[in-house]
Amino acid sequence: MVIQTADVIMPGNENAFETGRRGQISSIADLDESYRWLIEKNVTATLATVKRNGLPQLTPIWVAHDGVNILVNTKKGRLKDRNMRERSDVAILCVDPANPYHWMAINGKVVEMIEETDPAKGSQATDNVNELAQRYINTTPYPLRDPRGEVRVLFKVRPTYVMTFGPPPAG
């Protein structure tokens, strides 16, 4: 797997941005730590999917990674679930909450979908949502389940392009 990368470094002509380094990495684990932490700490990301009518749909999400894929967990039947099942191209934006000029945008494709009810792999979806709850709200198991039989779905998103901007705050 090869992931194209680009670092946006400074304003260019006519209020556009110039791209600095372009490169390639082989996996999310190869990202520079100054950006990888945006998907390893409790930063709320924004997921962009495409609706049936072609319009974008944005959702704040908790996010993780497995070294290769970005992990997105949701309730079966939600709009983002339906969109990712029908159209596998997505984008994820992670912005440093302390510095809005330090961010990472990831374009990718859904390569695997695991429903909690899958007898072979379903525990991955349950484990992931519980790990996210521990990281983001310091509690486990995930406490916000719909008591009417909610089924969680874990989407594995394979990055195809990563754009980064700005250094993290000093200190």
Question: Predicted segment positions?
Answer:
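Structural motif corresponding to alpha-helix initiation and N-cap regions
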Residues: 32, 77-78
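Short secondary-structure boundary segments
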Residues: 95-97, 159-160
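Short beta-strand segments
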Residues: 42-76, 84, 91-95, 103-106
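Short, basic/aromatic recognition patches
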Residues: 18-46
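Short, surface-exposed beta-strand-loop junctions and turns on beta-sheet-rich folds
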Residues: 78-80, 99, 171
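A generic structural signal for nonpolar/aromatic side chains embedded in well-ordered alpha-helices
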Residues: 38-39, 84, 132, 157
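Charged, gly/pro-rich active-site loop segments
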Residues: 1-29, 102-171
